[in-house]
Amino acid sequence: MDAFIATFTSPGPELFQLGPFALRWYGLLIAIAVLIGLNLSSSLARKRGLEQGLISDLLPILVLTSVVGARIYYVAFEWRNYSGNNFWSSINIFGLAIPIPSAVEIWGGGIAIHGALLAGTLAVLIFCRWRRQAFWDVLDVLVPSIALGQAIGRWGNFFNNEAFGVPIKGDLAWKLFIPFVNRPLNYANNEFFHPTFLYESIWNLLVFTVLIVLFQRSSKGLLKLPAGALSCIYLITYSLGRVWIEALRTDPLCLGALPPSCEGGLRIAQLMSLAMMAVGGFGLWWLYGRKRKLPDPGRPRSFA
């Protein structure tokens, strides 16, 4: 009996087009992830006793800064593709070509989750100082939604035919077809690749499950989970998966080298993941090894 083969083939990045405007799958998936995250984190915030409406006030700021941060991060490491003769592009509005910097064409793909995490964390910090909230408590109710949002958003890579892995060698029970136009030059003759979007989506669902189970057990008093512990666990568990999945990617952001191999250089996402694991590990050691609270950069409310 032949092994079951699941072949993933993208229908294309656009769901439909209305005049000059197109609804892209990636944008729709992000919108769905944001709505689910709003409801989930709001529910977790109530269980943590946080201020009512806090998450709905934070969310627009968090989404905007995360998207901008993700794009800036990506463009910074891929600047060769957005500079010189590639600096300018155009957008067609009712038949009129409007010149714009190519770096702002986010609808064409090109964002990096680590940039979103850095910018988003900074936004949460500033927001907490402004609203005098405990930074780690707020972050703890956000990270399950972040993990779930990543699981959903990774399917945008599938529709865009991007962020895929190396060609499949031998027989696998799954494979991803990539059109010729989207293949790296050195893999132009390969049709099927590792669906790294699927690997990371599944991994993020597992991370989400772990975080939710831990949160619920803590809420019921079955587990001691100090403020910040859940955030540290997210940093470690997400990064563990990203390190090995990134090794399969054909389009990594590289430092001192060019994709797909980054030969002679370093894969930025792996470096960032290792740094996140170190931060998360240190945080857990501080909480459970030294039995001390994490320093709070926010301004907790005074109940005096």
Swiss-Prot record:
Transmembrane segments: 18-38, 58-78, 106-126, 133-153, 195-215, 221-241, 268-288
Alphabetized GO MF terms: phosphatidylglycerol-prolipoprotein diacylglyceryl transferase activity
Subcellular location: Cell inner membrane
PROSITE patterns: LGT
Ligand binding (a 1,2-diacyl-sn-glycero-3-phospho-(1'-sn-glycerol)): R154
Membrane topology: Multi-pass membrane protein
Main location: membrane
Main enzyme class: transferase
Alphabetical list of InterPro entries matching this protein: Lgt (IPR001640)
Pathway assigned in UniProt: Protein modification; lipoprotein biosynthesis (diacylglyceryl transfer)
EC number(s) reported in the record: 2.5.1.145
Biological function: Catalyzes the transfer of the diacylglyceryl group from phosphatidylglycerol to the sulfhydryl group of the N-terminal cysteine of a prolipoprotein, the first step in the formation of mature lipoproteins.
PANTHER family cross-referenced by the UniProt entry: PHOSPHATIDYLGLYCEROL--PROLIPOPROTEIN DIACYLGLYCERYL TRANSFERASE, PROLIPOPROTEIN DIACYLGLYCERYL TRANSFERASE
Record family assignment: Belongs to the Lgt family.
Protein name per UniProt: Phosphatidylglycerol--prolipoprotein diacylglyceryl transferase
Species assigned in the record: Prochlorococcus marinus (strain MIT 9313)
Organism placement in taxonomy: Bacteria, Bacillati, Cyanobacteriota, Cyanophyceae, Synechococcales
